[in-house]
């Protein structure tokens, strides 16, 4: 009996047939012999294996030693509480800066807050390391994690709250990324920020987003790392090869007019944040073959939030990086043992080899983005009532060429692409505009490629006018 091909097999066949059918008919305008292709980068391969498990462990052990890091805890003691933890992280950044000849500036932006989880006016302070870019210093790539910790009662500021995974793991990763990237060249500015106030209401993310706006930063991406060190799920799954990257589908700052345009022209799954997530997936595929990025089409886990949200609300692209399988007995728990189950966020729940791989993903992503040009702006397409599609964009500084990408409208990742040289448009012959999504990336002379920018406001990496004018 002859078997019937599965739907998946048929889909793969369809894609292969389409690719063979389409490739011979592609004609691009203006590229000649000047096309620049993205290149495999040996320096990124070296970075991928550089994170130190020993460094990560030392940072987490030190943060745990402060007992609790609740935002509401002691700020005066040198041995216990959020104040001591902040000062230690600041000293660690300063030591890294000393080792690179002062290449890193350390700042501590803060604001006073009261709220549902902050009953009395409290200073929320972030500790931020800034490595200025050599070519495009106003363009900024940010890595964040939150320094504060909690137990079952979020208002309990005195009980021990080790917060080894939530989120000393994220802080350890960004400190290690700062150490490694302090020794590397970067055209765009790199920012590594240990935030406070996350557990009380994402206040530290707001402090940093407001600081970025006040400084005139052009934030290309915030990579928010929160709960990234555990490989043992509560459901019994052991998986040290998967990391989740959450990203919003439509921009948080989208206006009614922009939403109306998007509904008819597409862009529901192509915010700049979503294309940052796709970029991270490609980075992992190319440089970290033992780590799979699982893209999740949500801003965050169901009903939950993280410090990427204030960035999104400020109009900046941002994603959340989180372990593949969470264990809720180790999150937001009083330290205790019940019915043979050990509750609490202790260091025993951290897989340091896994944490090193997730740290590498962030480090390589930041390095690659910072060396590539900014994504193209002004991307637009035309081709209604035609069999060809024309893609337009504005040239950007530092780009030696551009690459046009397209994919089936139901495909999660870009499927096809072609280098088109140093031009501002391309005509794709025999590719009907109705059936595909399109985007454009920029490529440097030495082969570093930017994330893909989707056409229109829906996919633009530029901060939206609605966010700029927001009071």
Can you say where each PLM-predicted feature lies in the sequence?
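A non-catalytic alpha/beta surface segment that caps or lines the substrate-entry region
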Residues: 55-132
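Beta-strand-rich modules
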Residues: 428-449
